[in-house]
From Swiss-Prot:
Gene Ontology biological-process annotations: DNA-templated transcription
Keyword entries, A-Z: DNA-directed RNA polymerase, Nucleotidyltransferase, Transcription, Transferase
Function, in words: Promotes RNA polymerase assembly. Latches the N- and C-terminal regions of the beta' subunit thereby facilitating its interaction with the beta and alpha subunits.
UniProt cross-references to SUPFAM superfamilies, sorted A to Z: RPB6/omega subunit-like (SSF63562)
Subunit organization: The RNAP catalytic core consists of 2 alpha, 1 beta, 1 beta' and 1 omega subunit. When a sigma factor is associated with the core the holoenzyme is formed, which can initiate transcription.
GO MF annotation, one: DNA-directed RNA polymerase activity
Reactions catalysed: RNA(n) + a ribonucleoside 5'-triphosphate = RNA(n+1) + diphosphate
Protein name per Swiss-Prot or TrEMBL: DNA-directed RNA polymerase subunit omega
Similarity comment text for this entry: Belongs to the RNA polymerase subunit omega family.
GO cellular component, one term: DNA-directed RNA polymerase complex
Superkingdom classification of source: Bacteria
Organism: Thermotoga petrophila (strain ATCC BAA-488 / DSM 13995 / JCM 10881 / RKU-1)
Alphabetical list of Pfam families matching this protein: RNA_pol_Rpb6
Enzyme Commission number(s) from the entry: 2.7.7.6
Length: 79
């Protein structure tokens, strides 16, 4: 039996795991669009909002950012 997920989104905690603040909304938007149009969510929740579901999936490592090596070049090197 699958467990229902209760979730409290903390964007700052998500940024600690994924340090690409501009990539996170893009990934979430693309996943939310997929959920809305054709994809089955990876998590079970009472929340029906595709954006909330996509954030849950990203936070719980059900989805990830592809080509992360390319994004690493965009992180500024601050001294």
């Amino acid at each position: 039996m699958e467990k229902m997920v209760k979730f409290n989104l903390r964007y700052d905690e998500l940024l600690k795991k994924i340090p690409y603040k501009y990539a996170i909304p893009v990934v979430v938007a693309k996943r939310a669009e997929a959920i809305r149009e054709y994809a089955k969510p990876f998590v079970i929740t009472d929340d029906e909002n595709p954006v909330s579901i996509a954030f849950m999936e990203l936070s719980l490592n059900y989805i990830r950012i592809k080509n992360e090596e390319i994004l690493k070049a965009l992180i500024p090197k601050v001294k």
